[in-house]
């Protein structure tokens, strides 16, 4: 890398010249970088005029002739080209910042790459890790960000069973879908019912599986327990069997009339609990009992993962801490509260939080166990539907409401992201320095 002469550069002038990308770099005597930036801009301008402009125009209008114009395809293609425009805008402002920063570095006597060879060498030495993650960012852009943008756009259209392209055109309707959730009594009632059950479900089911997982791990880690490997295998069985098989099996077991729970388990329990004698619990025909069954099932399905995670953490806690606590006269509860649980929380907090976010969107158990039933709460939602399964109903019913489903999807995303970020911040989930 070549040194830099002491000629002073003007950072503001370099930034101003970079209004045309590349000129600021050329001013800083980085001609190779400048011509590359200028070339990227020329290619983008040609692409924008030839390809992006027509598609972005179609994105705004969503077509004007039914049958010929497919509004949905126009929206998707427009979103695709919009990503490239956004990427270039980020590049454009980065180019201005780069010119300003390099000019300041030159004035401070810091060497900067001038030739193409120096640039390649600098990238290899300092930027090689970033080159390796570029494919991941590209994949993430089109596998995650692109669908999110399309969903966001659909939420602001009237895409439903009455407006199905290409026979009908879509129109931009602004916030109508979001306001309809609150203004239309059917959707307002359904949304309130589904949201409240979703929150109860996520909190109850996740907490249950975490408590069972931590409890079984602590018991299995006790020195007086014999046959730990056998217990380990038994505790892992719910994890080893595919979840959909377990859910379908439980669905049969909880059948009101012929299920094993009512016909075999309850008669055995009735010997110890007389009030259960002759009882037939309506597991799949009463919404309350269905919800209880769902929570118990998720506790069974989810605890093995927490068990394995917690057991690994417990085995890594130094015995010196427990010995010191014993000398200080601490009992078992004090050891757990002041040593065990803080260590588990410090290491596993991100994973524990993810259990709540996962169950908030746990579609499979709702769909496979009882199809969101029994009964309905209006708006196309079943009595045990959570938000994600309600979205499924909105998009696959006889009168699909795609735009409304997209609006609910965005609401889910906002709720989950907000709660997760608050939880991560409050628990200092990624602050591992003190562990």
Curated annotation (Swiss-Prot):
One of its GO terms (molecular function) is ABC-type maltose transporter activity. Residues 195-423 form the ABC transmembrane type-1 domain. GO terms for biological process: maltodextrin transmembrane transport. The keyword Heme does not apply. The chain crosses the membrane at residues 34-54, 73-93, 130-150, 199-219, 230-250, 263-283, 294-314, 338-358, 371-391, 404-424. CDD domains: TM_PBP2 (cd06261). Belongs to the binding-protein-dependent transport system permease family. MalFG subfamily. PANTHER family: MALTOSE/MALTODEXTRIN TRANSPORT SYSTEM PERMEASE PROTEIN MALF (PTHR47314), MALTOSE_MALTODEXTRIN TRANSPORT SYSTEM PERMEASE PROTEIN MALF (PTHR47314:SF1). This is Maltodextrin transport system permease protein MalC. The lineage of its organism: Bacteria, Bacillati, Bacillota, Bacilli, Lactobacillales. The gene is malC.
């Amino acid at each position: 890398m070549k040194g830099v002469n002491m000629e002073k550069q003007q950072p503001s002038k370099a930034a101003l010249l970079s209004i045309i990308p590349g000129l600021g770099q050329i001013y800083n005597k980085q001609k190779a970088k400048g011509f590359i930036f200028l070339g990227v801009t020329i290619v983008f301008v040609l692409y924008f005029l030839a390809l992006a402009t027509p598609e972005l125009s179609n994105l705004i209008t969503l077509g004007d002739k039914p049958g010929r114009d497919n509004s949905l395809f126009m929206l998707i293609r427009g979103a695709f080209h919009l990503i490239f425009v956004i990427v270039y805008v980020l590049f454009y402002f980065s180019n201005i910042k780069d010119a300003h920063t390099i000019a300041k570095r030159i004035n401070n006597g810091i060497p900067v790459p001038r030739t193409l060879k120096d640039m390649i060498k600098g990238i290899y030495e300092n930027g090689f890790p970033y080159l390796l993650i570029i494919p991941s960012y590209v994949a993430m852009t089109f596998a995650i960000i692109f669908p999110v943008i399309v969903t966001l756009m659909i939420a602001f259209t009237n895409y439903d069973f009455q407006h199905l392209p290409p026979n009908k055109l879509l129109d931009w309707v602004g916030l109508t879908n979001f306001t309809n959730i609150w203004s239309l009594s059917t959707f307002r009632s359904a949304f309130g019912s589904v949201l409240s059950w979703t929150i109860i479900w996520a909190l109850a089911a996740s907490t249950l599986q975490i408590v069972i997982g931590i409890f079984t791990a602590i018991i299995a880690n006790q020195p007086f327990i014999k046959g730990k490997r056998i217990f380990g295998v038994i505790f892992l069985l719910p994890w080893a069997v595919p979840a959909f098989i377990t859910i379908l099996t439980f669905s049969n077991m909880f059948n009101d009339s012929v299920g094993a729970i009512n016909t075999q388990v309850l008669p055995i329990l009735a010997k110890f609990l007389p009030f259960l004698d002759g009882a037939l619990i309506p597991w799949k025909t009463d919404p309350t009992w269905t919800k209880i069954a769902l929570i118990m099932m998720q506790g069974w399905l989810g605890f093995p993962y927490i068990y394995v995670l917690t057991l690994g953490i417990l085995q890594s806690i130094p015995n010196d801490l427990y010995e010191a606590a014993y000398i200080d006269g601490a009992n078992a509860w004090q050891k757990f509260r002041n040593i065990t649980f803080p260590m588990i929380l410090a290491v596993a907090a991100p994973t524990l939080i993810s259990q709540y976010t996962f169950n908030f969107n746990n579609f499979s158990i709702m769909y496979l166990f009882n199809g969101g039933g029994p009964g309905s709460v209006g708006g196309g939602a079943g009595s045990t539907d959570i938000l994600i399964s309600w979205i499924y109903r909105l998009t696959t019913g006889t009168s699909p409401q795609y735009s409304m489903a997209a609006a609910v999807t965005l609401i889910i995303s906002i709720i989950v992201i907000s709660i997760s970020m608050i939880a991560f911040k409050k628990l200092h989930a990624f602050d591992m320095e003190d562990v």
